């Protein structure tokens, strides 16, 4: 299930291209309209920055290793919302955030384009098979549909994702030339798992979308819990660049990740997030040993739960002794 976005890549494009022709209607509602020239075309580059250096706690190495799903987005008006912080996600976005299944979300986007006339175009980019790397595509925006939203699932995770909600690429009467944004993890509010590899544990009743921070959820088991940090480093970045060439027919990007290449993030530019050692509680004291009439010794132990990394606090002593009166002395 975790790699379903990789397998659905080509089918996703076929579906998206079929939708584009039917989702270019005018929006409903009375929102202000962008007065920029009729159409603008942008390249969008998504860069994953999810490295073991920046996010050492419980970093997924196997089954599956850290990676990103395909990117799915839409150019739309204010009548449509793909997702929004502090609001409930749709069933389609729930399926995408939990399992990487895009079909229901794509159907919702199609319905918004046909019924609400609020979606101008949809776009997608291939998945990234590692935590660090990049993927890209192109999108077209229209003065009446100048907002852009997208989501990318964090794999593996219970229901965590990154994305953009209703970014306006129009500013007054002009299209923005470039937009660069750092991205941070969000919880879709549909699964209560605390760690990347948590088993499915539905949130009942469903919660709203929340941003995951270094201190929230405030639980040591959470994979993003770093109490020494004021804020998490960005886990991804997205760049929109306006293309100067005249509009042309929409063409999907190459689905060959090898030809595009994955950006390997320079380790010198990645912040080192300190990970402190975590140990268990002490065990019970053992029996007191020693000769009768003299003080003996007893001991207890604890074990390392999380090894320190990136100059985090080192582990304390794992064994402790104390004087005692010998047990069962005759």
Curated annotation (Swiss-Prot):
Tissue: Detected in heart, lung, thymus, spleen and lymph node.
Bridged cysteine pairs (disulfide): 34-170
Leader sequence residues: 1-25
Residues given in the record as a divalent metal cation binding sites: 140
Spondin domain: residues covered: 30-220
GO molecular function per UniProt: antigen binding; lipopolysaccharide binding; metal ion binding; signaling receptor binding
Assembly description: Monomer. Interacts with integrin.
Protein name according to UniProt: Spondin-2
